[in-house]
Amino acid sequence: MKKVILIKYGEIALKGKNRHLFESSIIENIRLAIGEGAPPIEQCRGRLYLQLTTEKDISCYREALKRVFGVVGFALAYRLNLEINLEEMEEVLIKHLRKLESKSLAFRVDTRRTVKSFPMDSMEINKKLGALILQHFPKWQVNLNNPELTIFIEVRDEGLFIYTTEDHEDGLGGLPVGVGGRGLLLLSGGIDSPVAGWTLLKRGMMIDAVYFHSFPYTGEKAKEKVIDLARVLTSWKLRAINLHIPYFTKIQETVNKMCPESTWTIIHRRFMMRIAEKLTKSTYHTLITGENLGQVASQTIQNIAVINQATNLPILRPLISFDKNDIIKIAEKIGTFRISKRPYEDCCALFAPKNPETKAKEEAILKAEENLPLNELINEALEKMETLRIKN
């Protein structure tokens, strides 16, 4: 008998011929989350399990698994040999349930048997173990439809696994980072963009980030804030993040000098898209923003459409329909909210017009841009760009 952590994964099991690639990714990510000294991870037909060397490892592994996208749930389980008889199974199970003896629980036994050569079928195991449990815990009752406690028995080629709902914890779900392509996140110091990046990590995308810095208008504290946000995202990506910081000051100064005030934000955003597209080359497949429909005056569908026209790359806006309260809840959960609330504004906030355009037309924006030295400004922003490799 051995103690293991049994790991369940969800959507990966639906991926057909590519399934092994998804499984390899989730195994790699579990190892990265645990760090040095990660135990062997074995596969068993829709499950993974970690071998436990000492009891002190359990809480460490549990915390690590809570940060791995693709993990639907996990449980501390007993792994027994398939040659085990009913009496030995009873001994292990009852010993495990003793900690709940004082409670009056409604329970059920739920057996999954993939090894058809096992001498008892699922129904027989359920009935026999259920009867034995009632003998040991007479205050308990069987309830198949609405149990307070479910005892799971999984009979697999690799062994017989026993665990309960008391041993089980939910995971993040989603897909393992690394299977969903690569994206470049436009990361500001606000609440929304880090959450947008996190939601794409949850869909398996490998992300890096770009932050548009307008020194001296936005100071070092604003930059440090964004670096700290990127560092939080690395703890979910489980890898370093490349943070590109183009020089954006001259672009904003030039736009604000040469273009109508109402168009400033839209033209700034179009410059951001052009610069981000230059950064992607063959490395990234998409841009990601934290834009949210109607949240601020510049984020109307008309303005978003005009901003899109500055690039040929797809732009993912995963928060486009979210309520602000829902975004804040995620930000609190993932650890970015307090950082985002630091009182240092980004370049968009500092250069915002008093009366921004809310229904922009491409012709009017192109007219406003026609005297701008677009290529010169973009090239200078990239030449003076700083790139930081942010590690957790």
From Swiss-Prot:
Q: What class of enzyme is it?
A: transferase
Alphabetical keyword list: ATP-binding, Cytoplasm, Nucleotide-binding, RNA-binding, Thiamine biosynthesis, Transferase, tRNA-binding
* Listed pathway(s): Cofactor biosynthesis; thiamine diphosphate biosynthesis
Origin, by domain of life? Bacteria
Q: Where is the THUMP domain?
A: 59-166
Q: Which GO terms describe its molecular function?
A: ATP binding; CCA tRNA nucleotidyltransferase activity; tRNA binding; tRNA-uracil-4 sulfurtransferase activity
UniProt GO BP: thiamine biosynthetic process; thiamine diphosphate biosynthetic process; thiazole biosynthetic process; tRNA 4-thiouridine biosynthesis
Residues that bind ATP: L186, L187, Y211, F212, R269, G290, Q299
Q: Which reaction does it catalyse?
A: [ThiI sulfur-carrier protein]-S-sulfanyl-L-cysteine + a uridine in tRNA + 2 reduced [2Fe-2S]-[ferredoxin] + ATP + H(+) = [ThiI sulfur-carrier protein]-L-cysteine + a 4-thiouridine in tRNA + 2 oxidized [2Fe-2S]-[ferredoxin] + AMP + diphosphate; [ThiS sulfur-carrier protein]-C-terminal Gly-Gly-AMP + S-sulfanyl-L-cysteinyl-[cysteine desulfurase] + AH2 = [ThiS sulfur-carrier protein]-C-terminal-Gly-aminoethanethioate + L-cysteinyl-[cysteine desulfurase] + A + AMP + 2 H(+)
What does the UniProt entry say about where the protein is found?
Cytoplasm
**InterPro entries, per database record:** Rossmann-like_a/b/a_fold, ThiI_AANH, ThiI_fer, ThiI_N, THUMP_dom, THUMP_ThiI, tRNA_STrfase, tRNA_sulfurtransferase_ThiI
* Keyword ATP-binding assigned: yes
What NCBIfam families does this protein's entry cite? tRNA uracil 4-sulfurtransferase ThiI
Functional note: Catalyzes the ATP-dependent transfer of a sulfur to tRNA to produce 4-thiouridine in position 8 of tRNAs, which functions as a near-UV photosensor. Also catalyzes the transfer of sulfur to the sulfur carrier protein ThiS, forming ThiS-thiocarboxylate. This is a step in the synthesis of thiazole, in the thiamine biosynthesis pathway. The sulfur is donated as persulfide by IscS.
Please give the family membership noted in the entry: Belongs to the ThiI family.
Protein name, as recorded: Probable tRNA sulfurtransferase
